[in-house]
């Protein structure tokens, strides 16, 4: 998935993001009725928890970290999805996105907004879920770095 960024809380683009999340939730509600094993991954443009943000106080209430966005993510999880990354003990400060404009990568000022959500039926098959930061250190990288999962099926 690519969930729209939302620009800023209260903006038209943010309202569009909220409608988009409502539509995704409805789609997943229907999908879970006939499918037991589902993986949803991509740029969610939502940092799930405070620990997924380099400085939670700076970002509190702002786009990517707002209560509204996190509430929609929680509603999706309540359909039976698990954040695969949080199934494992992870060191602090692991992020998947850094803003170019602030030289954020060099300053370790990132967020984890790229997620892999798995249905509970896949939990026992999840061997590893991690972030590969190596591509972000290349000469002309994306502002995101890959998030990966290993499943034993």
PLM features: residue spans?
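Active-site regions of metal-assisted phosphoester/phosphodiester hydrolases
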Residues: 1-153
């Amino acid at each position: 998935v690519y969930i729209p960024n939302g620009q800023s809380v209260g903006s038209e683009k943010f309202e569009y993001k909220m409608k988009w999340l409502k539509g995704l939730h409805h789609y997943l509600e229907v999908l879970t009725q006939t499918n037991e094993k589902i993986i949803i991954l991509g740029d969610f443009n939502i940092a799930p928890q405070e620990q997924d943000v380099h400085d939670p106080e700076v970002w509190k209430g702002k786009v990517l970290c707002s209560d509204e966005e996190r509430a929609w993510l929680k509603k999706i999880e309540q359909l039976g999805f698990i954040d695969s990354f949080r199934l494992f003990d992870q060191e602090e400060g692991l992020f998947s996105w850094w803003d170019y404009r602030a030289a954020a990568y060099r300053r370790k000022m990132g967020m984890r907004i790229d997620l892999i959500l798995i249905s509970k039926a896949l939990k026992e098959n999840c061997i590893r879920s991690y972030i590969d930061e190596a591509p972000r250190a290349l000469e002309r990288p994306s502002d995101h770095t890959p998030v990966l999962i290993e499943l034993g099926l």
